[in-house]
C-alpha cells in the first residue's frame, strides 16, 4: 500500500463476539486506523514514508496586552468565543468601569447559564505600539483573566501563523493608524471551569 492509498474513509466494525485478549465486549465498535494499516502493510525492510498526524491536544495560547494603561493581563486567545471578556477581579485591578445595564447570558462549557456583570466600553489594549479599543464584557469568576474572542480578530483583521511545534504569532492591524504588529503568543495550561 502506498501512502497515497491511505483511506480517507473510516472503516467501522461491530465485534460479533467478545475479544478476551483485547478485553472488548461483544458488540463493541472497532474503528480502523489508516496510518496503522499503512505501517502494517509495509514489506519487511521497506522504509516507511513519514506521515504527519495531529497531536491529541495542543496548549491554549495567551498574549499579554497592557489594559487601560495600567495592568498587563494574561489574555487567552480564543477565536471560538463571540466576545471579549474579563474577570471582575482583573477589571477592578485595571480600574475599569462598566455599564451594568448591558448584560448578556452565556452558556459555559459545562452547559450552565450565567449572566455577565456588564460591559466596559472602549477599553484600551496596548500591543507594542498599537492601541486598540475593545468592548469588554465583565464576568464573575471565569476560568481565565481575560479572553480575546472574535471581536479582537475582526477589529484587527488578524492573521495567525501556527508552526508544527504549536507556536503561534498573531499579525494585527490597527484600523486607526494602519500600523501592523506581530504579537507572539505563549503556551498556557488551562484547567477549565
Outline where the language-model segments fall.
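Pepsin-like aspartyl protease folds
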Residues: 4, 9-70, 104-119, 147
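Aspartic protease core domain of the pepsin/retropepsin superfamily
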Residues: 11, 32, 82-89, 95-193
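Conserved tryptophan-centered aromatic signature that marks the ligand-binding surface of SH3
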Residues: 72-75, 82-84
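Short conserved micro-motifs on helix faces and helix-strand junctions that flank
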Residues: 75-77, 146
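Short phosphate/oxyanion-binding micro-motifs
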Residues: 77, 94-95
